[in-house]
Regions:
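N-terminal secretory targeting modules
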Residues: 1-67, 72-80, 91, 95-102, ...
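Alpha-helical cap/lid subdomain in secreted, periplasmic
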Residues: 8-14, 57-60, 83-218
Length: 218
């Protein structure tokens, strides 16, 4: 029997790294819990998220949607569709808050796209065929560097989602570039204004890069 291996690469400046053996990570360690704690910039008003969780626990269908750039698409993840942060967090939500197979997943990540295009893609890639997501994660903290509006398009996308008739929850995710840079200082005021949950990968992982084993590195 023949065996074929297929590996996908994104044509946006990213290359998938070689596969490495996963090291054991103690998710109850002080270091790990500290990293997770640093990632939460703001809890915000949890009402809409709580409603989605209650809906899922009641056995009703809940949809999680993710829109962003190549990081949301899965750049660097192997396999790209099941090891990306979007799918992993969807799985975690499903395992924690679902008593049956009632949680659905939409991934609308496209490499190299800013929130200016995200405003258009949201209709095409998320709301397609009458979809009504209950939670929407927005990730453009790397791709919006060239945004001439300096955050106006980003806020417009956030407002567009918040104003949907069924009132989905919105989570702002601030990913980080390879040189420890992102745009969370520009975009965070949007989350402050609308009292939204905000998660910073920059705050969570960059302190780890200078640590050695035995110094709290995870």
């Amino acid at each position: 029997m023949g065996k074929v291996s297929v590996r996908l690469f994104l044509n946006d400046g990213y290359e998938a790294p070689p596969e490495e053996e996963d090291l054991f990570i103690d998710m109850h360690s002080e270091e790990y819990c500290g990293m997770i704690s640093r990632s939460l910039l703001q809890l915000g008003n949890p009402y809409r998220i709580r409603k989605a969780i209650e809906k899922s626990k009641a056995g009703k269908e809940v949809t999680l949607a993710y829109i962003g750039g190549s990081i949301t698409q899965g750049a660097g993840a192997i396999p790209i569709h099941t090891e990306c942060y979007a799918y992993k967090s969807f799985q975690l939500f499903q395992n924690r808050f679902s008593t049956q197979n009632n949680v659905r997943f939409i991934k609308a990540g496209v490499g190299g796209t800013p929130s200016e295009l995200g405003m258009i893609r949201f209709d095409r890639d998320v709301l397609r065929e009458g979809e009504r997501p209950d939670i929407v994660v927005i990730e453009f903290a790397v791709n919006d560097e060239g945004d001439e509006t300096k955050g106006v398009c980003y806020e417009s996308l956030v407002r567009k989602v918040l104003k949907l008739p069924w009132k989905p929850a919105v989570v702002l995710l601030f990913s980080v570039f390879a040189n420890d840079w992102n745009l969370q200082e520009r975009l965070r005021p949007v989350g402050d204004l609308y009292d939204l949950p905000m998660v910073s990968i920059l705050n969570a992982v960059t302190p780890q890069f200078s640590l050695k084993c035995g110094e709290g590195r995870i």
